[in-house]
Amino acid sequence: MTGPAAAPVPDAPASLDVSGLAFAYPDGHQALFGVDFCVARGERVALLGPNGAGKTTLVLHLNGILTGGTGTVTVAGLPVDKRNMAEIRRRVGIVFQDPDDQLFMPTVREDVAFGPAAAGVKGAELEACVDRALTLVGMAEFKDRPPHHLSFGQRRRVAVATVLAMEPEILVLDEPSSNLDPASRRELADILRSLDVTVLMVTHDLPYALELCPRALILSDGAIAADGPTAALLSDDDLMRAHRLELPFGFDPRSVRASG
């Protein structure tokens, strides 16, 4: 799973296809209103939007944590439904904002091994799987360390490794740059660029989205309000204002060479 980021493969099934997805919570709050989008294999796509737009609700549908709405979600051609749930949860790896939500074992190695071991991987194959995932995120030398002895940035990289160990079709990242110092932020960006995996990145960090994702979706009031090149969307002042998105003071997306 190393090497340059894969180019989209036009003849392969889309990594992610969301069609007509609508969802209301039991209290009657309608969070999603007919969401439609498709992510090709190998794409890196940012999911942007203000608080309350429905981003978390959408993400929780991608691997079946939330169900019961209308519309469909498919991952590499496989519908997200009860029959396919085990395989869907292998194919869709979600890295949560707080790595401590994913790291709960005594050592880094045990955390990364947990998913594959639960899926029946054993022995030398399991060790190779752990080593491969930790190498991808530059954390192989820390595999015998307790996670709570690591820095926040290192724990986030280990959290990514726990997902990569399952060899997912798509990596979903929730606010990956939050609480990272500049060096850790840069290191994580380099890692994400190197992965041969489809990426959907949920973030309020618009410069990071521009740096890593050639394409962006804006989710606003439970619907896709815009879908296009990240640089173009961030340069559209009217669009940004309409959906309560703000760039850092002095940051001009037109002056930045976006990630390819």
UniProtKB/Swiss-Prot annotation:
The keyword Cell membrane applies. One of its GO terms (biological process) is cobalt ion transport. One of its GO terms (molecular function) is ATP binding. It is a peripheral membrane protein. Its EC number is 7.-.-.-. Belongs to the ABC transporter superfamily. This is Putative ABC transporter ATP-binding protein SCO3161.
